[in-house]
């Protein structure tokens, strides 16, 4: 079992239940899924870029990503309908908790000029999104083999009813929010 999943079930559930004033342990918010998205607009010009992006996302997530394709043609961006322009992967279960562990303990502290995560990135329903400017913050990416620095979006979907519950859940997991 993943370290954070074990920690959540044995310690955080009871702590969050009292902290949030909930009656039933089934009301305690959990993390449902984590979605990683990497937009690769340059892939329209060069197909190799998409391969490198897919390899990076596979290494980070530990799971094969799905190629996202453009929905319509946009002349200004020089893309056509159906061209590959990104990649995404959805993590659930043990892989999700293992990724979250690596994100909190290794990747976030390695971000350059890091001063804490913004607490304003909640969507109103307890879900949190953050963007990373460099994929090299993750230990799975070998800096020497990277063709270019790419960012990625990370969306954490929770069962929280509001932002306060979501913030309490992520803070309990150890997310370094700005004070």
UniProtKB/Swiss-Prot annotation:
GO terms for biological process: translation. The keyword Aminoacyl-tRNA synthetase does not apply. GO terms for cellular component: ribonucleoprotein complex; ribosome. One of its GO terms (molecular function) is tRNA binding. Disulfide bonds: none annotated. It comes from the Bacteria. Keywords: Ribonucleoprotein, Ribosomal protein, RNA-binding, rRNA-binding, tRNA-binding. InterPro entries: Ribosomal_uL5 (IPR002132), Ribosomal_uL5_bac-type (IPR020930), Ribosomal_uL5_C (IPR031309), Ribosomal_uL5_CS (IPR020929), Ribosomal_uL5_dom_sf (IPR022803), Ribosomal_uL5_N (IPR031310). This is one of the proteins that bind and probably mediate the attachment of the 5S RNA into the large ribosomal subunit, where it forms part of the central protuberance. In the 70S ribosome it contacts protein S13 of the 30S subunit (bridge B1b), connecting the 2 subunits; this bridge is implicated in subunit movement. Contacts the P site tRNA; the 5S rRNA and some of its associated proteins might help stabilize positioning of ribosome-bound tRNAs. Belongs to the universal ribosomal protein uL5 family. Part of the 50S ribosomal subunit; part of the 5S rRNA/L5/L18/L25 subcomplex. Contacts the 5S rRNA and the P site tRNA. Forms a bridge to the 30S subunit in the 70S ribosome. This is Large ribosomal subunit protein uL5. It comes from Francisella tularensis subsp. tularensis (strain SCHU S4 / Schu 4).
């Amino acid at each position: 079992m993943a370290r954070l999943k074990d920690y959540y079930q044995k310690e955080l559930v009871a702590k969050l239940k009292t902290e949030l004033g909930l009656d039933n342990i089934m009301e305690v918010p959990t993390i449902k899924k984590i979605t990683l998205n990497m937009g690769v607009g340059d892939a329209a010009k060069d197909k190799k870029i998409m391969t490198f992006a897919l390899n990076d996302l596979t290494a980070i997530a530990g799971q094969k990503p799905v190629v996202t394709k453009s929905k319509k043609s946009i002349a200004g961006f020089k893309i056509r309908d159906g061209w590959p322009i990104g990649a995404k992967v959805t993590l659930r279960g043990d892989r999700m908790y293992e990724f979250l562990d690596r994100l909190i303990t290794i990747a976030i502290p390695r971000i350059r000029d890091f001063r804490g995560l913004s607490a304003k990135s909640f969507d109103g329903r307890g879900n949190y999104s953050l963007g990373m400017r460099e994929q090299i913050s993750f230990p799975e990416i070998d800096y020497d083999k990277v063709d270019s620095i790419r960012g990625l979006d990370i969306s954490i979907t929770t069962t929280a009813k509001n932002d306060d519950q979501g913030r309490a859940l992520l803070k309990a997991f150890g997310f370094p929010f700005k004070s």
